[in-house]
From Swiss-Prot:
Keyword flag Ribonucleoprotein: yes
Purpose: Binds directly to 23S rRNA. Probably involved in E site tRNA release.
Annotated organism of origin: Methanosarcina mazei (strain ATCC BAA-159 / DSM 3647 / Goe1 / Go1 / JCM 11833 / OCM 88) (Methanosarcina frisia)
Gene name of the encoded protein: rpl1
SUPFAM superfamilies, sorted: Ribosomal protein L1 (SSF56808)
Protein name: Large ribosomal subunit protein uL1
Length: 213
């Protein structure tokens, strides 16, 4: 059951923000308190599966070859990078940066991981886009599908951070349930739960914001 205050805030933001000629992202601005963010244990680094997804298709890059690469492409991967192409990226950091900015996330067969870490870590690491390892017993199609509905909560060393919860053209109830899912995870992982939340606002990309916490 969606909390009325969250649903009301979502509806108000959508209704009162000027309409754009593109589908705006709906985000949460999360402000923490009473935490020493110099201590890694206090930093938020969580993946959350949203019940209603983000309302858009994520661009996923997959480092794979052979049958896994073919199945990744069939499952909707935007890019499938072979071992030969990985070598090319390692030799051309500008090309690697373009790919890193183009993709929302990456998945890699485990045998690719050491090479990626050594040659592309400097590009992917700071962007929070180091690949998710594809374990031998995991189906690439299922993994791609699950990641389409996933978001990362990453505070790094800051008390304030943002996370997307969907698109403006989504149903307000669906957006609200996505927000509740994120809030529930946050309260579980923070040292003092909701008492470590100074405030949380819902906002559109270029619109107004409304407080939900």
């Amino acid at each position: 059951m969606v909390e009325r205050t969250i649903l009301e805030a979502v509806k108000k933001v959508i209704e009162e923000s000027p309409k754009r000629n593109f589908s705006e992202s709906v985000d949460l601005a999360i402000n923490l308190k009473n935490l020493d963010m110099n201590q890694p244990k206090n930093r938020v680094d969580e993946e959350v599966i949203l019940p209603h997804g983000l309302g858009k298709e994520l661009k996923i890059g997959v480092f794979a070859k052979g049958d896994v690469g073919l199945r990744a492409k069939a499952a909707g991967a935007a890019y499938v990078i072979s071992d030969v192409e990985l070598e090319e990226l390692a030799a051309d950091k500008n090309k690697a940066r373009v790919l890193a900015n183009e993709c929302d996330l990456f998945i890699a067969e485990t045998q690719f991981m050491p090479i990626i870490g050594k040659n592309l870590g400097i590009v992917l690491g700071p962007r929070g886009k180091m690949p998710i390892p594809l374990m031998p017993n995991k189906d690439i199609g299922e993994l791609i599908q699950s990641k389409q509905n996933a978001v990362k909560l990453r505070s790094k060393d800051r008390l304030t951070f943002h996370v997307a919860v969907g698109r403006r053209n989504m149903n307000p109830d669906d957006l609200s349930e996505n927000i509740e899912t994120i809030m529930s995870r946050l309260e579980r992982v923070l040292d003092k739960g909701k008492h470590n939340l100074r405030s949380v606002y819902v906002t559109t990309t270029m619109g107004k914001s409304e407080r939900v916490v």
